[in-house]
Design a protein with these regions (language model features):
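Active-site beta-strand/loop signature of hydrolases that rely on acidic residues for catalysis
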Residues: 3-8, 24-50, 110, 158, ...
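Short catalytic/ligand-binding loop motif for oxyanion handling, primarily in non-cytosolic enzymes
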Residues: 12-14, 44-47, 76-80, 106, ...
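Short, solvent-exposed aromatic-acidic interface loops
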Residues: 75-76, 122-128, 174-176, 255-259
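Short, P/G- and charge-enriched loop/turn segments at secondary-structure junctions
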Residues: 84-100, 142-147, 225-229, 252-256
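Active-site catalytic loop in hydrolytic enzyme cores
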Residues: 109-163
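Metal-dependent phosphoester-hydrolase catalytic domains
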Residues: 115, 120, 162, 177-200, ...
Length: 271
């Protein structure tokens, strides 16, 4: 069983800053995961050609209807005009959710294994702004800092049927505000403990490796690898955390892909 997390950076490439759908398809096929959590996902955004990125990833993976979902963190365009997702809105995309209702931004979860149930966990934005590092416009340039207000976040979890029983897999993209991302992580981990065990959390936690491990007592880091920036990774922001009785990890990889400023993290389980 092969699980992966990938911050898709709205489908953009660092090479030229362009969004080319074929590149995202190439990246997803290279990852070749049985279960994939994706972050910074656009739906119906002009900046990424108006595509439903989660649906495009589902096609690239060969995931059937009912086994993928997009969960919006916000409606509108991040960094521009947006509104919070209404309480109780539920998954905003996926074959069972009806037509898209305008631009949205969030996370997606896709599984080649049968999905038994879906759960979403909203995570409130920080009350303060914070500096955030963004990639340089030049491929080998140094990252630059921008002062940005925070935005709502969300986690999406699926209970999967595997050969050895139920497995819950979740994905999220936490706040860049120091400390607030720890608050969000602890709230999320508490919610995930209430779901069928074992659990694997896939995501961009915006926390360096050692901080994430300290903030998640009782959870095992299944991959200790640098993931950012993609061209020359020095920091681990993208994590795979496990809770409960999981198979042994056989291999971990961080392939360099034609899209994103992050490396994907791919974990291969035994069996």
């Amino acid at each position: 069983m092969r699980l992966a997390t990938f911050n898709v950076f709205s489908g953009r490439s660092l090479a030229d800053g362009q969004v080319v759908p074929a590149r995202l398809t190439e990246a997803v096929r290279a990852i070749d995961a049985d279960v994939l959590g994706i972050q910074e996902v656009d739906r119906d955004q002009p900046r990424s050609g108006g595509v439903d990125m989660t649906a495009a990833v589902a096609v690239a993976m060969g995931v059937p209807d009912g086994q993928w979902r997009f969960e919006p963190a916000l409606l509108g365009t991040p960094g521009e005009r947006w509104t919070a997702v209404p309480d109780g809105a539920g998954p905003a995309a996926g074959p069972a959710a009806g037509p898209a209702q305008g631009p949205a931004y969030g996370v997606g979860l896709l599984s080649r294994l049968p999905v038994l149930d879906w759960h979403a966990v909203p995570l409130a934005s920080a009350p303060v702004a914070s500096p955030v590092l963004v990639p340089s416009e030049r491929r080998e340039g140094r990252p630059r800092a921008l002062w940005l207000p925070d935005e709502p976040r969300v986690a999406l979890a699926a209970v999967l049927a595997t050969a050895v029983g139920a497995l819950t897999v979740a994905t999220t993209h936490l706040s860049f505000v120091p400390g607030w991302n720890v608050v969000q992580l602890r709230r999320l981990l508490g919610a995930l403990r209430e779901l069928p065990q074992p659990v694997v959390l896939l995501g961009d936690l915006n926390l360096p490796g050692p901080v994430a491990r300290i903030a998640a007592p009782g959870w095992r880091p299944l991959a200790r690898v640098a993931t950012w920036p993609a061209t020359r990774p020095r920091v681990q922001f993208d994590h795979v955390l496990g809770h409960g009785d999981l198979p042994a990890v056989e291999a971990v990889s961080t392939p360099e892909l034609p899209v994103s400023d992050h490396r994907a993290v791919v974990v291969q389980f035994a069996g």
